Design a protein with these regions (language model features):
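Short active-site segment of divalent metal-dependent hydrolases/proteases
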Residues: 80, 107-108, 139, 210, ...
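A short C-terminal boundary segment appended to hydrolase-like catalytic domains
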Residues: 44-57, 253, 279-341
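Juxtamembrane low-complexity tails/linkers enriched in Ser/Thr-Pro and polybasic
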Residues: 2-15, 308-314
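N-terminal active-site segment of His-dependent metallophosphoesterases
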Residues: 23, 33-117
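Active-site glycine-centered loops adjacent to acidic/histidine catalytic or metal-binding residues
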Residues: 77, 104-105, 136-137, 207, ...
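Residue-level marker for buried hydrophobic side chains located in beta-strands
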Residues: 72-74, 100-102, 133-134, 204, ...
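N-terminal Sec-pathway targeting helices
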Residues: 6-30, 319-323, 334-341
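Extended active-site neighborhood of metal-dependent phosphoesterases/phosphodiesterases
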Residues: 42-66, 112-202, 217-240, 248-285
Length: 341
């Protein structure tokens, strides 16, 4: 009898221990889910109440520089790393650059709060220097791969457009899906035919390059778009192509036109030079010249928490995840109660 009683008592104690463990884990999961949902609601509300920043593209505008020459900067692929952006924007603000061409992936996630956070950062760090952008894949793709340009258009304006500065025509294109559709290529063809003759030089800037000199079959335009793009720009007076997406600096040529790909300014570096950077250019009567790529050190003071708060935390999938975690916690609580019976 004593042996049987001891065995029964030991079993009850073990069930009691496991019941307590399940109860504790269930409470932790429920509490964690409620905290995440509460934080998400607070962050969404705080960012939506923030001062809305807009960096609308100067579509069709014609700027006249005070002198015969001017400087401009070009950057790409920030992602969610605030610290390199701060250093790069500070460098540009102190330089002679009249404006910045940003060729995509300024953000990491496509949601209003993250766009707003990055816009606030740029406005604070860049000051009065204008930023003119074209979309990258991160601006138009959701986490599950759905293409939507509406948020980008609201903050930055059209995906493709032209403007001029002095004797230079700048044409921004939307290569965010690694392709150009018929409508955009027809627009480019008409722009080069009607607008290009009014200016001495022409620069085309876009996110995805037509070719990738390091990995020929990756991170470039799809074959059909690449070939059609070449047909449109060949022998049309285009003087320079500027792209990003590949996360390294390179100089090459496409369709008889010089092509420069920009270093990453925050996303993972794919270069022997383990630094983030941008490129400075000078335009004068002799043409458009690359001055130099400018690199900054990759420090450790990255504001990942702010980036997470404005991006991943406010993603709609967080709500579904929190519901599942909450339900799991409830199940564990009931499991613990059953074990006590």
């Amino acid at each position: 009898m004593n042996s049987s009683q001891n065995s029964t008592g030991g079993g009850k104690r073990r069930r009691s221990v496991w019941a307590r463990r399940l109860n504790i884990l269930g409470i932790v999961l429920i509490f964690g889910a409620l905290v995440v949902v509460s934080m998400r609601s607070f962050v969404v509300e705080s960012f939506n109440d923030a001062r809305h920043k807009s960096f609308m593209a100067p579509a069709g505008k014609m700027f006249a520089p005070a002198s015969g020459h001017f400087y401009f900067a070009a950057g790409s692929d920030t992602g969610a790393r605030n610290e390199p952006v701060e250093r790069i924007m500070n460098e540009i603000r102190k330089s002679k650059a009249r404006f910045v061409l940003y060729v995509g992936d300024l953000v990491r996630y496509r949601n209003p709060s993250h766009f707003q956070w990055m816009a606030e950062e740029i406005d604070e760090k860049l000051g009065k220097t204008p930023l003119y952008a074209v979309p990258g894949n991160h601006e138009i793709l959701s986490v599950n791969g759905v293409v939507d340009r509406s948020l980008y258009n609201e903050v930055f304006g059209p995906g493709y457009y032209w403007f001029s500065y002095g004797e230079v025509l700048f044409v921004g294109l939307d290569s965010s899906t690694s392709a150009y559709d018929d409508e955009q290529l027809q627009w480019l063809d008409k722009t080069l035919a009607k607008i290009r003759p009014q200016f001495k030089y022409c620069v085309i800037f876009s996110h995805v390059p037509p070719v990738n000199v390091k990995v020929p079959n990756d991170h470039r335009l799809f074959d059909e778009s690449r070939d059609r793009f070449a047909e449109v720009i060949r022998n049309r007076g285009v003087n320079l192509l500027i792209s990003g997406h590949v996360h390294y600096y390179s100089e090459s040529e496409f369709a008889g036109v010089p092509l420069i790909t920009l270093p990453s300014s925050g996303q993972p570096i794919r270069s022997e030079i383990k630094k983030f950077g941008y490129v400075m250019f000078k335009a004068d009567r002799d043409g458009i010249a690359k001055i130099k790529p400018v690199y900054v050190e990759a420090g450790d003071d990255m504001e990942h928490w702010e980036a997470f708060m404005s991006s991943a935390l406010v993603d709609e999938d967080i709500n579904f995840f929190s519901v599942w975690v909450f339900c799991a916690g409830v199940v564990l609580l009931f499991g613990g109660k059953i074990l006590r019976l």
